[in-house]
UniProtKB/Swiss-Prot annotation:
Lineage: Bacteria, Pseudomonadati, Pseudomonadota, Gammaproteobacteria, Enterobacterales
Protein name, entry field: Superoxide dismutase [Mn]
Residue sites binding Mn(2+) per the record: H27, H82, D168, H172
UniProt-listed Enzyme Commission number(s): 1.15.1.1
Reactions accelerated catalytically: 2 superoxide + 2 H(+) = H2O2 + O2
Functional description taken from the UniProt entry: Destroys superoxide anion radicals which are normally produced within the cells and which are toxic to biological systems.
GO cellular component: cytoplasm
PANTHER family recorded: 37S RIBOSOMAL PROTEIN S26, MITOCHONDRIAL, SMALL RIBOSOMAL SUBUNIT PROTEIN MS42
Enzyme class: oxidoreductase
Length: 206
């Protein structure tokens, strides 16, 4: 089984004016495609791992040969992270129900959660991701470097938990529109969070 670039469930301009068409198209067709290509190339000599869903593969990095571990950490990680990211974007959804209640329970308020998430995203030095994760029965905000995922576990990524939503803070995710203004990009994210997808992921794991 080879990994393939997932189709987006919307047009490249669907998130305008918050996320711009040019960035979305380049991000999807160039950056994400490269992660897919590199992961597939690394897996050609690893048939015992090649059939695993990418979300499972990245939980087994410590089982990989040493010469494949880093390339798959980076590229299978990039494929997994971006596949989640695209599905997590949509205009016009509302945070409600069980997920909203859990956020209020674990952060005190939705505003407190947003402030903590924004801080994690803004303070991630260099490239990486900010995440809302479910750890046991509690929600938490974590961040990871590069294309690391909380699914990789604390020993590898410095974080753990099941991702409910994630935000890419690599410069390629925002530089064409926002240049060096990462905090502005982070603020715009709240206008395009697919809370329905986040709620479904939460419901599947709670």
């Amino acid at each position: 089984m080879s990994y393939t670039l997932p189709s987006l469930p919307y047009a490249y301009d669907a998130l305008e004016p918050h996320f711009d068409k040019q960035t979305m198209e380049i991000h999807h067709t160039k950056h994400h495609q490269t992660y897919v290509n590199n992961a597939n190339a690394a897996l050609e000599s690893l048939p015992e791992f090649a059939n695993l869903p990418v979300e499972e593969l990245i939980t087994k990095l410590d089982q990989l040969p040493a010469d494949k571990k880093t390339v798959l950490r980076n590229n299978a990680g990039g494929h997994a992270n971006h596949s989640l990211f695209w599905k997590g974007l949509k205009k016009g959804t509302t945070l409600q129900g069980d997920l909203k209640a859990a956020i209020e329970r674990d952060f005190g308020s939705v505003d407190n959660f947003k402030a903590e998430f924004e801080k994690a995203a803004a303070s991630r030095f260099g490239s990486g991701w900010a995440w809302l994760v479910l750890k046991g029965d509690k929600l938490a905000v974590v961040s990871t470097a590069n294309q690391d995922s909380p699914l990789m576990g604390e020993a590898i990524s410095g974080a753990s938990g099941f991702p409910i939503l994630g935000l890419d803070v690599w410069e390629h995710a925002y530089y064409l529109k926002f240049q060096n203004r990462r905090p502005d990009y982070i603020k715009e994210f709240w206008n395009v969070v697919n809370w329905d997808e986040a709620a479904a992921r939460f419901a599947a794991k709670k």
